[in-house]
Regions:
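N-terminal positive-inside, membrane-proximal cytosolic segments immediately preceding the first
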Residues: 1-8
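Short charge-dense sequence patches
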Residues: 5, 45-56, 84-93
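General structural signal for secondary-structure boundaries
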Residues: 7, 40-43, 93, 128, ...
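Hydrophobic membrane-insertion alpha-helices, especially the h-region
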Residues: 11-26
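Electrostatic cytochrome c docking/interface patches
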Residues: 25-51
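Periplasmic/extracellular electron-transfer cofactor-ligation site
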Residues: 42, 48-79, 103-114, 141-148
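Extracytoplasmic electron-transfer domains, predominantly the class I c-type cytochrome c fold
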Residues: 72-140
C-alpha cells in the first residue's frame, strides 16, 4: 500500500466519521417527531405501488438496496441502502424518513446544520405528504415485528 492509498483511506474514513457524527446528532434531534396515524391496508398498497414507481430503481424491487451500500463511491456518496431488515432504515424515527424522502438527504441534513453528501433526491415536488407516509408505511410493513 503506497502513500496515496493510505491518504485515500484516511480521507474516506474521515468523511464517513464526520458525516456519521453529524447525522447522529440530527437523528437525535428529530427522534420525537410525530408521524401519521396507523396506516390502513389501502394506504400500504398505495405505498407499495408508489415505492415501485419512485424508489425501486435505486433501493431495489425487493428493498435490497444497491450493492456495497456501506462504501462510498469516488464522489464520496454512499449507494442507496436497503430498506429491508438488513439495512438501517428501521433504526430511524419516522420523521427522519419523511424528511429524507420529501427534501432529499442533503437538504434534510442541512436543516439540522449537518453538511453531508447524499445521493437521495427529494420527492416533495412529485409526491404529496400522504403519499410519502404511505411509502414509509409500505416499507415498514415488510419488516419483522421486532423492527417495527
Amino acid at each position: 500500500m503506497d502513500a496515496s492509498d493510505v491518504m485515500r483511506r484516511y480521507l474516506m474514513l474521515s468523511v464517513i466519521f464526520l458525516g456519521g457524527g453529524g447525522a447522529a446528532a440530527w437523528l437525535m434531534s428529530t427522534a420525537g417527531v410525530l408521524t401519521e396515524s396507523t396506516p390502513e391496508a389501502a394506504d400500504i398498497a398505495q405505498g407499495e405501488d408508489l415505492y415501485r414507481e419512485y424508489c425501486a430503481a435505486c433501493h431495489g424491487a425487493d428493498l435490497e438496496g444497491q450493492p456495497d451500500w456501506r462504501s462510498a463511491g469516488p464522489d464520496g456518496v454512499l449507494p442507496a441502502p436497503p430498506h429491508d431488515e438488513t439495512g438501517h432504515t428501521w433504526h430511524h424515527p419516522d420523521g427522519v424518513l419523511f424528511d429524507y424522502t420529501k427534501l432529499g438527504g442533503k437538504a434534510a441534513l442541512a436543516l439540522q446544520g449537518v453538511e453531508f453528501e447524499s445521493g437521495m433526491p427529494g420527492f416533495g415536488d412529485q409526491l404529496s405528504d400522504a403519499e410519502i407516509w404511505n411509502i414509509i408505511a409500505y416499507i415498514q410493513s415488510t419488516w419483522p415485528e421486532r423492527q417495527r
